[in-house]
Amino acid sequence: MRPTPRPMGAAALLLLLGLWGRPASAQRAAFPDDFLGLTRCEAGRPVTRLRPDVRDSLLREQLEVHEAVHRRQSDQFGSCEAFMASLGSARRIIEVELPAYCAQWRVAVRQGADSSATRRDFAWRIAAQSGAMENRLEILQRLERECPVRPDQPPP
């Protein structure tokens, strides 16, 4: 004899609907401590902070070059707050991060990092930061096109 199906309890139904009805989230929102270096506005000026646990001098040099690009971008934008407010889309984040990671990549390669692997890693980071992981190959292609080893070299 088969057991008679029992009606789903109200609590079980609410739990099921609560789990099913919530939007899926691939990852949590980023926090400042997630970044090894971060440039933000303080008293209207771009200020960079590197995490205190970053002690490797080679990595610190890379991060300082990367964040210097963001400070220059902010200065060219008119105001730090306006620059930060402009970072509202994946496309805009990619546009801002490409030159910063390009500068960091040049330093890393000069320090002996593998050119291709580092460029690929940086493309993935840009894609993740912008929330556009589906564009990671396109971002890698842009880094290859727009970021020669030496800044005075024309793009291929």
Language-model segments: residues:
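Long, well-structured alpha-helical subdomains associated
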Residues: W105-P156
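Bacterial N-terminal signal peptides
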Residues: A10-L19
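Catalytic zinc-binding patch centered on the HExxH motif and its immediate surroundings
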Residues: S25-R49, V54-L58
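Post-HEXXH active-site segment of zinc metalloproteases
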Residues: L58, S74-Q104
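Bacterial N-terminal signal peptides that target proteins for export
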Residues: M1-A11
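Active-site recognition of the HExxH zinc-binding catalytic motif
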Residues: Q62-D75
